[in-house]
A protein has these predicted regions:
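Polysaccharide-binding and catalytic clefts of secreted carbohydrate-active enzymes
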Residues: 1-111, 115-131
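Carbohydrate-binding surfaces of carbohydrate-active enzymes
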Residues: 37-48, 75, 83, 95, ...
């Protein structure tokens, strides 16, 4: 989300296109309550810092606008790419991320692609993987999808970053295939030496190839080779 002046102006234009005028916006948002009535469209701002509760009508429209703005950018990028290439076009989805309406994004993608980072310490993670895989296949009308990102080990952004247990990387990879994935990609190949994701696991960790992570990566790759016949199903 962006709350700058340019985004605020675009939000107001979107509202006028949707509702017609500021009076209709007032009615839709119920601004008479708590004396929030707007007299001019220029008074309307994105839902920035508030001393108390946000207006839910304003919040809903703001999130719909934010989704529209991002999706419009992808549409423009898709148009440019398509002028020069007939290769499949996609972008990273993030499971059931609540701020984007993936049902509207899916028609822009030639193949549905997802990022998935369940917590290895969460006993519900297997259910989340199954649900997320089914959602992706549903967004593609039953077609196979692509796992764009998963971690071979621990991430770096949770309060507690649990490593994957032995065999868990293979198990979760196979689970994605069972729920319709046609390809499995990892983030990242070699663990970063510096930067914000220094402690995010890589296929080749800081300890090198003589490590449990690399052993799991190799065994998972061998398993995927043996499952090649199910490609496209």
């Amino acid at each position: 989300e962006s709350f700058d002046d340019e985004s605020a102006a675009a939000f107001r234009r979107w509202l006028v296109e949707k509702y017609g005028d500021v009076q209709a916006i007032n009615r839709a948002w119920g601004t008479a309550f708590w004396s929030q009535t707007y007299r001019d469209i220029q008074e309307i701002q994105p839902p920035r810092a508030m001393p108390t509760f946000y207006n839910p009508g304003q919040m809903l429209d703001w999130r719909r606008f934010s989704d529209y703005a991002l999706r419009s950018q992808m549409e423009r990028e898709r148009e440019v790419i398509r002028r020069y290439s007939d290769r499949p076009i996609t972008t990273n989805f993030m499971g059931t991320f609540p701020l984007l309406d993936y049902r509207k994004w899916a028609p822009l993608c030639d193949i549905i692609a997802d990022d998935s980072y369940p917590d290895p310490a969460d006993p519900q993670a297997a259910h989340d993987i199954a649900w997320q895989g089914d959602v992706m296949r549903g967004l593609g009308d039953g077609a196979p999808w692509l796992l764009m990102e998963q971690s071979p080990g621990a991430v770096q952004w949770r309060p507690q970053n649990s490593p994957k247990r032995p065999g868990q990387f293979l198990l979760w990879t196979i689970a994605r295939l069972a729920h319709g994935a046609d390809g499995i990609l990892q983030f990242q190949w070699r663990q970063s030496a510096k930067g914000s994701e220094t402690f995010h696991a890589g296929m080749v960790p800081h300890s090198g190839e003589d490590s449990p992570i690399w052993t799991d990566v190799v065994s998972t790759g061998q398993a995927l080779k043996s499952l090649a016949p199910i490609t496209g199903t």
